[in-house]
From Swiss-Prot:
Pfam families xrefs: Cytochrom_C (PF00034)
Name the UniProt record assigns to this protein: Cytochrome c-550
Classification via Gene3D superfamilies: Cytochrome c-like domain (1.10.760.10)
GO molecular function ontology, one term from the record: electron transfer activity
Keyword terms: Electron transport, Heme, Iron, Metal-binding, Transport
């Protein structure tokens, strides 16, 4: 179901993207707010 996929994607983001970009998207990684 979509909700399961969404939850999994959110979990992946939390553990991977956020670790680099920061939880508020202002971390050391590229600025994701402009994508």
């Amino acid at each position: 179901g979509g909700s399961v996929d969404s939850a999994a994607a959110e979990e992946v983001f939390e553990s991977n993207c956020a670790s680099c970009h920061g939880a508020d998207l202002s971390g050391a990684g590229p600025d994701l707010t402009q994508v």
